[in-house]
Regions:
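Catalytic Tyr-X3-Lys loop
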Residues: 85, 101-121, 140, 157, ...
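Short C-terminal tail/terminal secondary-structure segment
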Residues: 97, 229, 240-253
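Alpha-helical segment proximal to the catalytic Tyr-Lys
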Residues: 128, 173-177, 237
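Residue(s) in the substrate-gating loop at a strand-loop-helix junction
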Residues: 144
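A glycine/serine/threonine-rich, flexible loop-to-helix segment
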Residues: 177, 189-212
């Protein structure tokens, strides 16, 4: 298995895409360290995964937008696992949907904080950890195909994810000499709990959206996870600085 004896840290791992990434890595033999702000859901996920997998699964609830909080969580993980071989920064959120001109400064700050700064904070500490310890590694940041196509009525989120793409490629250029790879996975609409809740209220919106996806269905979190797992593995050793869309073909519809 491609992740046998490897330790991987995943943020935003309590549910949705982050949980799917954890499952995909576990399927390939990884030990995983799961971080999320939602302690209750995180603990439930850990219990579920431990019932399904035999490898080492640990978790810690923390505020991922705060560098001190994340650094503390990171080094608690180092104390337990000794070393990390890969990181996936999956945690993100958007504060509201609406016309561009209706967003307040508070909406802007909250969305940028939860969709861009959260990646910047974690990436900075991960790179520092790898470089300080003279380690190689692979990092995958989760973006969105809205960063490429734009996203009507969620413009701040789309712009924040475009910033994630550019940050990732910029950092990839800086750290490649240390044999640290940084890539981006850009999901389309994935069947997460939040998406399910929205479409339960707006079933016609789901039907309309699915028509714009070449495969005519929403994605599953494990499908994002499988791509991330590959990028975190040595099988992707010559892939660096790339933005990989996993969206059922919606970005070329």
């Amino acid at each position: 298995m491609e992740h046998s004896q490897r330790n991987i840290l995943i943020t935003g791992a309590a549910q949705g895409i982050g949980k799917g990434i954890a499952q995909a890595c576990l399927d390939q033999g990884a030990n995983v360290y799961l971080l999320d702000i939602n302690e209750e859901v995180l603990n439930a996920t850990v219990s579920e995964l431990r019932s399904l997998y035999k490898t080492n699964i640990e978790a810690f609830a923390c505020e991922l937008t705060d560098d001190k909080s994340f650094k503390n969580a990171l080094y608690k993980g180092v104390d337990h696992f000794s070393v990390f071989h890969g990181f996936c920064n999956s945690a993100a959120s958007s504060q509201g949907i609406g016309p561009f001109e209706t967003f307040s400064d508070k909406d802007f700050d909250a969305t940028v904080n939860l969709s861009f700064k959260i990646v910047w904070t974690c990436l900075k500490e991960e790179i520092t950890y790898l470089r300080d310890n003279k380690l190689t590694g692979s990092i995958v940041n989760i973006s969105s195909n809205s960063a490429i196509r734009g996203y009507a009525f969620n413009s701040i989120y789309a712009a924040s994810k475009a910033a994630v793409n550019n940050l990732s490629q910029s950092v990839a250029k800086e750290v490649a000499r240390d044999q640290i790879r940084v890539n981006v996975v850009s999901p389309g609409t994935i069947n997460t709990p939040g998406v399910e809740a929205y479409f339960a209220k707006e079933p016609s919106a789901k039907e309309k959206l699915e028509k714009t996806i070449l495969l005519k269905r929403l994605g599953d979190p494990i499908e994002i996870g499988n791509t991330v797992s590959f990028l975190l593995s040595d099988r992707s050793s010559y892939i660096n600085g790339q933005i990989i869309s996993v969206d059922g073909g919606s970005s070329i519809y």
